[in-house]
Amino acid sequence: MRKLPRAFYNRDTIVVARELLGKLLVHGSRVGRIVETEAYLGPHDLASHSSRGLTKRNAAMFGPPGYAYVYMIYGMYCCMNVVTEREGHASAVLLRALEPVHRVTGKTNGPGLLCHAMGIDRRLNNHDLLGDDFFIAEDNFVWERSSDRDLHRPVAPGRALPQPTTFRIVKRPRIGVDYARHWAKRHLRFYIAGNLFVSRK
């Protein structure tokens, strides 16, 4: 499984948000395919946490690219973001939905749900995504359905597919950011067309 390098994240946030689709989020033995993301472009983006300036809560956003920004909402759900662009730019990509691939149980069609299913909590905030137990990788496995648990499992680990899996990307406004004035209408949510695990069409 080829881990994404730092340079992948140190690029335009919209590009990263689109190209994270189809990649694998790995936490320990749990694996899920990213099928929906949202881009948050920095302090000028009124929907972004960084628009309020640097705080203890959002400090990870101001750090180097390729780190996790994990925060809690409603006092009970965690959301995971991936920090993008240069250090201090304060932009990130929210992971909104995953397709379960290996040893993932429970719903994954929402940012809080996917964190719960993947065992992600605030202890992973500011975690380097180039580590060994929590990272994002290219999908270079050949998978099959496991009839007993209705999960995917690798049948040819490490065997590269002859061509990357292709899919159509849909763009929509982000969810739950009505307060962000004109930024609420920007099409900065991306998902894989036709995927059953997307949080909202």
Q: Where do the model's predicted regions map?
A:
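Conserved, well-structured core segments that form or line functional sites
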Residues: 1-144, 148-154, 158-201
